[in-house]
Amino acid sequence: MSMQDPLADMLTRIRNAQMAEKPVVSMPSSTLKVAVAKVLKDEGYIAGYQISSEVKSSLSIELKYFEGRPVIEEVKRVSRPGLRQYKSSDDLPKVRGGLGVSIVSTSKGVMTDRAARAAGVGGEVLCTVF
């Protein structure tokens, strides 16, 4: 069975692993997933990530906890295959008054909503993280 929404699968695996207090979560790798993992690491939501290139490449994400609680409190998929969400740089959503981040796929790559506003580019709002 093929996966319909690989990014939603990635976010669900992260959410489930954090609820089970796992230190690392693994999943099939893709270019988009690696780009999202890089943004999550740069923003401090995960401790790190690693790509292993065996027969099928897999992405391992090292989860981050603070005082026994997951750093990521909420992660939501915004744009989905059935309803894509494209926003201009002026209309990009702020998550919880700027405390969280929206991850946006732009023509200049995958970046946070703040970076996209600074670059003056819009794009597809992939997910929100708080």
Curated annotation (Swiss-Prot):
Annotated InterPro entries: Ribosomal_uS8 (IPR000630), Ribosomal_uS8_CS (IPR047863), Ribosomal_uS8_sf (IPR035987)
UniProt subunit comment: Part of the 30S ribosomal subunit. Contacts proteins S5 and S12.
Name of the protein described by the UniProt record: Small ribosomal subunit protein uS8
Keyword annotations from UniProtKB, A to Z: Ribonucleoprotein, Ribosomal protein, RNA-binding, rRNA-binding
CC annotations in GO: ribonucleoprotein complex; ribosome
Task of the protein: One of the primary rRNA binding proteins, it binds directly to 16S rRNA central domain where it helps coordinate assembly of the platform of the 30S subunit.
Molecular-function GO term, any one: structural constituent of ribosome
GO biological process: translation
Similarity annotation: Belongs to the universal ribosomal protein uS8 family.
One Pfam short name: Ribosomal_S8
Record has Glycoprotein as a keyword: no
Top-rank taxon: Bacteria
Encoding gene (name): rpsH
